[in-house]
Amino acid sequence: MRLDLCRDVVGGPINQRELKILSVLIAAGAGPSHTCDVMQNTPTKTRPDSRPLLLSVVVPVKSVSPNFANLLGALEDSDCEVIVVQAQDSMPVGSEPQHLAGNVKWIFAPPSRGGQIAAGVKHARGDLIWVLHADSTGVDHAKGYLKTLASLGQPVWGRFDIQLLGHHAGLVWVARAMNLRSRLTQICTGDQGMFFHRSVLQQVGGYPSQRLMEDIEVSKKLRGRGRFLAPNIPISTSGERWERDGFWRTVAHMWLWRLRYFLGASADQLYDEYYGNPSRERL
């Protein structure tokens, strides 16, 4: 992992000497976790050893994602926990709880991306919380960055750079626009793998449980609280929606929904319109 990627920090860069020292300590102290907690209501509060839990990863899921098993494999780590929050009454997502790695928990919540994320945050034991969508890929460098950041214990929040995977040439420019916009405005999108120190979320009453636009809402609340980090580290996600629904049509609709939300449209109203289209089933 490159340790010079802590860039674009509001309030000044994190001390690079601390990052280097702590990354060595993390590597030296890593070991296997034998905890397997698959449950619906109450999380396990203790670990089989005395080492502190560094990072909690929350993954909301609703339906099958071809990449889901690969994502869980990439997140298997003794120094982080993964909380999969499946929408109640939804179809299985492709992995049976008894086959999960030891650091994965499987819980259920009413179908609502914000609500599922909020439920995952409540079950999380780590002080740094990372929200990933089920179709995210290429997360190894981002995970290493957050493990080091978590050990510093600083009240920060932020996101990573997004890369959109697909065949349409415009996906590169959409991703660049998303990254630039969020870097300048601190209004982020969930596809960018947003992360939060628990203390910062607590200042704004926790993660918003609304059904849509939860990423915009939490960004608005967190602006000016803690330090905003936009490391130049990419994670990838599918550009399927742009290719499936039409590139320019999708760009226009996404901007329109965001504008309507900023102008006062409710998240419930926008959710009903968005998911009223049968092709938009994946959370």
Give the ranges of each region predicted by the language model:
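Glycine-rich, basic loop-to-helix element that forms the pyrophosphate-binding segment
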Residues: F108-A124
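Conserved nucleotide-sugar donor-binding
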Residues: R125-G126, D191-V204
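Short aromatic/hydrophobic "clamp" motif used to bind/position activated sugar donors
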Residues: I129
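Acidic donor-binding loop at a coil-to-helix junction in glycosyltransferase catalytic cores
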Residues: L212-V218
